[in-house]
């Protein structure tokens, strides 16, 4: 292995967001021998940046890693090159930029493989990772490692990928849809003038989709269509009331528009996910991606859609670290390589990461580049 390769940072560069997973050692760097391995204890930590603000990500890496690691900047003479695991389309699109600005070379990992690897890592090693959310009730799910497969992974990023997972390294992308997080943000910006995903989500919290959506009760005079199992509050047509209200966009409250849009995207994803699970006889569906962000309304909408169409036979399950699946998968791919050439400056990098993982990493909604996801206690074996 190249001695300049660092084994505790991985990136997933998507169309909307850049996700980072990095290792933070506990206290001073220490080693203890166990079966011929050096064991470093610490935490996996998480951060995110908007892809359109990629310079913020570059500055984060430059200041928090390169500045303290003893690695000279690209303009200096004899600087070291760092090989970092990266996945997502941006690993190709921005490879030259990272090389030019930071002297970083990407060791690229396949996007689908990284997603599956990240989910399997979480489900097998992190307690209380998966949970259901229905009717306002959050329930953690105990995962039986002997009965994990097969399952359907629905990753909601800018678009949506649906992957049937049959085992470690055994998966197939069986479907997807272009109506995902990018659709929500794109239409939301056009319709509400919101500037960011977080701002749009916050706006949706205060909205009422019934002002714009046409419900079954609007068609049936306030009653259910019980013969086919539709309640009066079920949505018959998203944005349907705009047809006959005789109003212009400015006549509607932006929070109601945001709420209706979020409901429309979530319902659509939930239904398509179940239909694909039905094709392959899958009962467990895991939803991931930053579109969800632990938002109760989104999770409940997806869960209701899966529950309704499956008549209660299929489960929608969510993940605490939902937005970092690809980055985690890329990170765990370091396990396939030898670390016997680890050099002292790597230890310095680990301390540098630790220095920026404390109070500076508290989450500030909307304006922060840093994510509120919980850290994961872990150790790294250096062979």
UniProtKB/Swiss-Prot annotation:
Domain of life: Eukaryota
GO molecular function terms attached to this record: ATP binding; pantothenate kinase activity
Effect of gene knockout: No visible phenotype under normal growth conditions, but homozygous double mutants pank1-1 and pank2-1 are embryonic lethal.
Disulphide bridges, residue numbers: none
Pfam name, any one: Fumble
PANTHER family with a match to the protein in the record: PANTOTHENATE KINASE, PANTOTHENATE KINASE 1
Catalytic activity: (R)-pantothenate + ATP = (R)-4'-phosphopantothenate + ADP + H(+)
Regulation: Regulated by feedback inhibition by malonyl-CoA.
Keyword DNA-binding on entry: no
Source organism of this protein record: Arabidopsis thaliana
Entry protein name: Pantothenate kinase 1
Function: Catalyzes the phosphorylation of pantothenate the first step in CoA biosynthesis. May play a role in the physiological regulation of the intracellular CoA concentration. Functionally redudant with PANK2.
One of the protein's GO biological processes: coenzyme A biosynthetic process
Pathway(s): Cofactor biosynthesis; coenzyme A biosynthesis; CoA from (R)-pantothenate: step 1/5
Tissues where this protein is expressed: Highly expressed in leaves and developing seeds. Expressed in roots, stems and flowers.
EC number: 2.7.1.33
């Amino acid at each position: 292995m190249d001695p300049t390769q660092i084994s505790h940072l991985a990136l997933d560069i998507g169309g909307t967001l850049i996700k980072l997973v990095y290792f933070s050692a506990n206290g001073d760097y220490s080693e203890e021998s166990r079966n011929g391995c050096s064991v470093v204890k610490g935490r996996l930590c998480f951060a995110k940046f908007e892809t359109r603000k990629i310079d913020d990500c570059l500055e984060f890496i430059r200041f928090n890693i390169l500045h303290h690691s003893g690695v000279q900047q690209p303009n200096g003479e004899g600087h070291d090159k760092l090989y970092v695991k990266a996945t997502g389309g941006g690993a190709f699109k921005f490879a030259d930029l990272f090389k030019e600005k930071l002297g970083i070379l990407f060791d690229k990992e396949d996007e689908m493989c990284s997603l599956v690897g990240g989910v399997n890592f979480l489900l097998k090693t992190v307690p209380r990772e998966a949970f259901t959310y229905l009717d306002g009730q959050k329930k953690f799910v105990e995962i039986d490692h002997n009965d994990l497969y097969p399952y359907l992974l629905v990753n909601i990023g800018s678009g949506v990928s649906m992957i049937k997972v049959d085992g470690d390294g055994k998966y197939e992308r069986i479907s997807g849809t272009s109506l995902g997080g990018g659709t929500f943000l794109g239409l939301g910006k056009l319709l509400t003038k919101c500037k960011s995903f977080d701002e749009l989500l916050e706006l949706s919290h205060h909205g009422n989709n019934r002002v714009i959506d046409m419900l079954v009760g609007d068609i049936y005079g306030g009653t259910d269509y019980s013969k086919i199992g539709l309640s009066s509050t079920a949505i018959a047509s998203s944005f349907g009331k705009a047809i006959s209200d005789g109003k212009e966009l400015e006549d509607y409250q932006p929070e109601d528009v945001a709420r209706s849009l979020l409901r429309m995207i979530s319902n659509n994803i939930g239904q398509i996910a179940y239909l694909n699970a039905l094709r392959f006889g899958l009962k467990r569906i895991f939803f991931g991606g930053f579109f969800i962000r632990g938002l109760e309304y989104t999770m409940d909408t997806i869960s209701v859609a899966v529950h309704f169409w499956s008549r209660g036979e299929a489960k929608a399950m969510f993940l605490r670290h939902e937005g970092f699946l690809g980055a985690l998968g890329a990170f765990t791919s370091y396990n396939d390589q030898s670390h016997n050439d680890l050099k002292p400056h790597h230890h310095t990098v680990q301390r540098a990461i630790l220095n920026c993982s404390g109070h500076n990493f508290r989450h500030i909604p909307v304006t922060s580049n840093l994510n509120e996801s919980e850290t994961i206690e872990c150790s790294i074996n250096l062979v």
